Each structure stands twice: as structure tokens, then as C-alpha cells.
Amino acid sequence: MNDMVCAGRVTSTHGVRGCVRFRSYMSVDFKFPGIDVSIGGVSYTVCGAFSRGFPMFVLTLSRVGSACEAEKLVGFDVFLSESLLPPLQVGEYYCKDLVGLAVYDLEECVGHVSMLYDFGAAAEVLEIVLLSGKKVMIPFTSAFVADIDLNKKRLAVVFPPEI
């Protein structure tokens, strides 16, 4: 499985038959059953999934038949093949494509994107490491992100006055 992307994280066990609770980083309508995933470097097939209220799901995995086996997976990220990702609409981006982009304020490079956070609020938050080494966070909204050019590997931002 090359070109793996993180789809979420196992947060706890569910029941006594080896199911796991999973916090998804995917879109609401992503279909998990039948896909192969990697957890802790081991491959599993998702045999079943049901929602516990997005973004939480309960997954049934191949070769995990008890709560003890499921417990060993808690805390691990769940990876899947990038080829399984759904196509994006105009103006949508995958987090993996934004991390590492150079950040520009007008025409001057001022740093790079180090992380994209989703704290469950109305908007995701970009963490930017400035050339000085200082880390700043701005909302990932059109009010602060003026342009994204993946071909040029750059993101133009409008910093609030206090930054």
C-alpha cells in the first residue's frame, strides 16, 4: 500500500466482539466497508461500519475478533490508499496537500504551513511557521486565505493586524 493517507484514529473499543470506535478525518459520506486499511503497520479489511454521529464510527475489522485484540489498536492512526480518496470539488483541498506550502503575505514569503487543525469549530485552523520560527494560527477561511496554488506550492494569506 503506497501513498497512504491518514483517514482517522482508533479511539476506543466497542463491545466484546472486537469492534473499534474510530474518529474519521474523511468526509461525511466516505464509505469504509470493503476497503483495506493499515493500523500500526498491519493491514486489515473493514468488514463493516456504522456511524455514531459524524465523525465517530464503529468499525468491524478482519482478524480482530475480541475486545482484547481491539484494545491493542487504540490510539493508532488508520491509513488508507490515496487512490481511495474521492475527487474534490473546486475550492476543496486535502490537508496533505496544504501542509508544507509556502505562505505569502502579498508577494513576500513569510513562512510555511505546518499543520491544519480541526477542533470541531466552524472552521479549520492553519498553523503557520513564520521565517522567524514563530508559530501563528489563522482560520482556514476565505477571509484569511486569499489564494491557494498547489502547482506553485504557495498559499496567500491576509494576516490579522495583531500578527
Curated annotation (Swiss-Prot):
The UniProt keywords, alphabetically, are: Chaperone, Cytoplasm, Ribosome biogenesis, rRNA processing
Q: Which GO terms describe its biological process?
A: ribosomal small subunit biogenesis; rRNA processing
Query: Where found in the cell?
Result: Cytoplasm
Where does the record place the PRC barrel domain? 90-155
Q: Which GO terms describe its cellular component?
A: cytoplasm; ribosome
Domain writeup: The PRC barrel domain binds ribosomal protein uS19.
Q: What family does the database annotate? A: Belongs to the RimM family.
Tell me, how does this one assemble?
Binds ribosomal protein uS19.
- Protein known as: Ribosome maturation factor RimM
Q: Which organism is it from?
A: Neorickettsia sennetsu (strain ATCC VR-367 / Miyayama)
